[in-house]
A protein has these predicted regions:
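Active-site glycine-rich loops that stabilize anionic/oxyanionic intermediates
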Residues: 38-42, 228
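Catalytic active-site module of serine/aspartate enzymes centered on a nucleophile-bearing elbow/loop
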Residues: 251-304
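Catalytic nucleophile-loop/oxyanion-hole region of alpha/beta-hydrolase
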Residues: 41-44, 70-104, 272-273
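Short beta-strand/loop motif that positions the catalytic acidic residue
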Residues: 218, 224-226, 230
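N-terminal cap/lid segment of alpha/beta-hydrolase-fold proteins
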Residues: 1-26
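Alpha/beta-hydrolase-fold enzymes
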Residues: 112-197
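Short alpha-helix in the alpha/beta-hydrolase fold that links the catalytic acid
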Residues: 220, 234-243
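Conserved alpha/beta-hydrolase
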Residues: 51-75
C-alpha cells in the first residue's frame, strides 16, 4: 500500500503560515495518527524512512516545518525557542483535529524536536490525549566542545542586545550519520541550513535542563531513543530524562556505535532502530476503527 502525500499551510500561534505535509493511509478516517517534529536546521521531508516503516499499517503521518526552517517562513534559525515552537505545535494539533479529525496521536520529536515534544507533553498531553511520547537524539543536553562552549557563553551575554543575530551552528555534517549518502544528501538539500540565532540557541540550551527537572510530570508512555556515539546531543540528557519520568510505562533504547540521526544511519542499523519504533508506536496507537463505524472522510489542504 502506498501513502497519499499531501501538503499545505496552517496558521502558527501568531498567524504565520507554516508548512506541513502528511502521508495518509488508504482509509484516513480509520487510520491511527503519528505526528513528527524535526530537529534544528532540517525539515519534515527528511523523515521518509519513518514514513516507509508504517506503510500498510493504517497510520496517518503528519509533520510540520518549524518557523525559520524548511518551507516555512521566517529568518533561518531564528525563533524564541519553545516560546514559539510549543504554541506552534499546539496550533498544528488544532489544525489536524479540525481538518483531519486527528485524535489520540503518538508524538515523535527528534533532536530539537525532542525538546519541543517534551515541552508540549508537559503542557498539553491530557488536553490532546497523547497516546505516547517518543524522542530520538533529544537535544536536552548538547555535546559542546570548548569552542562551542565559548560561543554559548558569548551568546548568552549578547542575547539581550541582539536576540535575532544568527551564527553558524558549526557542527560537522559527518556527525549526523555513518551513511555517506545521508551526509551528501543533507549537504545538497537547499531546505537545510546551519544557522541559529542567539535567542533560539540559548533558549533551547536553557530549556533542556529545565525539562529534565520537570520530567516527573510526564505520565504518559514514553520511548526514549539515542545513539551512544551521538556527539551532537549527549545521551546523558536522554538517560536522565528517562530516569526522571514518572510514567509507569517507559523504555530507554540506546544504540551502540550510532550517531545523532538514528533513523538515517546505515541501512542495517537503520532497520534495527525503525523496527523498535514500529513496535512501540503500533503498540500504543488505538486499534484501527472498524470500516462500518469509521468517520466520514477528512478535508485536506492542497499543496501550495
Amino acid at each position: 500500500m502506498s501513502y497519499q502525500r499531501q501538503s499545505g499551510k496552517f496558521p502558527g500561534w501568531d498567524g504565520t503560515p507554516l508548512f506541513y505535509q502528511c502521508w495518509l493511509a488508504d482509509d484516513p478516517a480509520r487510520g491511527r495518527n503519528l505526528i513528527i517534529h524535526h530537529g534544528i536546521g532540517e525539515h519534515s521531508g527528511r523523515y521518509q524512512p519513518v514514513v516507509d516503516t508504517f506503510s500498510g499499517e493504517q497510520v496517518n503521518i503528519f509533520a510540520l516545518d518549524a518557523r525559520g526552517h524548511g518551507r516555512s517562513p521566517g529568518k533561518r534559525g531564528d525563533s524564541r525557542a519553545l516560546a514559539d515552537f510549543v504554541p506552534d505545535l499546539e496550533c498544528f494539533f488544532e489544525f489536524l483535529k479540525s481538518e483531519f479529525q486527528v485524535r489520540q496521536p503518538v508524538l515523535l520529536g527528534h533532536s530539537m524536536g525532542g525538546i519541543v515534544a517534551i515541552g508540549f507533553t508537559l503542557r498539553f498531553s491530557n488536553q490532546w490525549h497523547l497516546r505516547s511520547l517518543v524522542t530520538s537524539g533529544a537535544g536536552l543536553r548538547p555535546s559542546l566542545d570548548f569552542t562551542q562552549k565559548i560561543k554559548a557563553t558569548v551568546g548568552r551575554l549578547l542575547r539581550p542586545l541582539a536576540p535575532s543575530l544568527t551564527v553558524p551552528i558549526g557542527l560537522p555534517l559527518t556527525l549526523l550519520s555513518h551513511d555517506k549518502q545521508v551526509i551528501q544528501s543533507y549537504d545538497k538539500d537547499p531546505l537545510n541550513h546551519g544557522m541559529v540565532s542567539l535567542q533560539m540557541g540559548v533558549g533551547l540550551m536553557d530549556a533542556g535542563e529545565d525539562l529534565i527537572r520537570q520530567a516527573d510530570r510526564v505520565k504518559i508512555p514514553v520511548l526514549v531513543m539515542h545513539g551512544e556515539e551521538d556527539q551532537i546531543a549527549s545521551m546523558t540528557g536522554s538517560i536522565d530524562f528517562h530516569e526522571a519520568c514518572s510514567s509507569p510505562e517507559k523504555e530507554l533504547r540506546l544504540y551502540p556505535g550510532l550517531f545523532h540521526e538514528i533513523f538515517n544511519e546505515t541501512p542495517a542499523e537503520r532497520q534495527r532502530v525503525l523496527a523498535d519504533l514500529h513496535r512501540w508506536v503500533l503498540a500504543h496507537l488505538p486499534e484501527v476503527a472498524p470500516r462500518e463505524t469509521a468517520a466520514t472522510g477528512a478535508s485536506t489542504v492542497d499543496a501550495t
